[in-house]
């Protein structure tokens, strides 16, 4: 778990954190399709804005903040609670471009667990129960993020990405869930990953099962 330092002072500084707004691309109740929590019911909040801009990204509309509606913490918490999801996944875009303290406090005060999917390119913020780090070679994660990583999920296209995966795994805490994920439009990466995992069984495979299931 990651908790921001001096939390009480920061909360006091926010007159009413429930009224803080975030640019939101979409929010929805679905099944987590990737990673360690695949198959679990979850509520997704996709923030707008990204400084990584992966060419294979399937939500390029999330890159720019402009043009997306602003939603308050109060509104987002209400939607998440009404869905009856056991946990919320904050994703993007790159969600850590925003101060997540108000949003995560609101969600946790409602009894929800908070997960995040991030490239780690910006400093951690907020209260986070599960951190999935998906690092990119062209926008490296901050060093501070590694101490808090619960799950390392690396998108693989070529052998270079396998080397990159190992470099990042070496910085993660013992017990971190290690996953390799094929890039959806690069099927040849599947054979590469399968053989690598057979030879290195500390790694597992993450698939984008939501695309097979045809759910958001």
PLM-predicted stretches and their roles:
Residues 3-10, 18, 22, 41-42, ...:
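Conserved Radical SAM active-site core
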Residues 6-13, 29-31:
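A short, compositionally biased domain-edge/stem linker segment
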Residues 15-16, 185:
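A general boundary/transition motif marking the beginning of the first structured unit of a protein
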Residues 16-41:
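Short, charged low-complexity linear segments at domain edges
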Residues 26-29, 34-35, 61, 144, ...:
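Flexible, active-site-adjacent loop/turn segments at secondary-structure boundaries
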Residues 77, 96-216:
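Conserved AdoMet/S-adenosylmethionine-binding subsite of the radical SAM
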């Amino acid at each position: 778990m990651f908790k921001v330092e001096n939390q009480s002072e920061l909360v006091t500084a926010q007159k009413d954190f429930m009224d803080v707004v975030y640019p939101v691309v979409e929010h929805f109740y679905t099944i987590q399709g990737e990673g360690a929590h695949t198959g679990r019911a979850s509520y997704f909040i996709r923030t707008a804005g990204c400084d990584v801009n992966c060419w294979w990204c399937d939500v390029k509309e999330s890159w720019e903040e402009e043009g997306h509606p602003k939603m308050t913490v109060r509104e987002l918490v209400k939607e998440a609670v009404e869905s009856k999801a056991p946990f919320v996944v904050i994703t993007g875009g790159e969600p850590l471009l925003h101060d997540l303290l108000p949003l995560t406090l609101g969600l946790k005060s409602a009894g929800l667990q908070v997960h995040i999917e991030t490239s780690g390119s910006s400093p951690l913020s907020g209260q986070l129960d599960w951190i999935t780090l998906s690092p990119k070679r062209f926008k490296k994660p901050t060093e501070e993020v590694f101490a808090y990583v619960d799950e390392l999920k690396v998108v693989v296209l070529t052998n270079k990405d396998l080397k990159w995966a190992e470099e990042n795994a070496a910085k993660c805490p013992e017990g971190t869930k290690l996953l390799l994920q094929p890039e959806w439009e690069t099927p040849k990466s599947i054979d590469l990953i399968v053989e690598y995992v057979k030879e290195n069984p500390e790694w597992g495979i993450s698939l984008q099962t939501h695309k097979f299931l045809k759910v958001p």
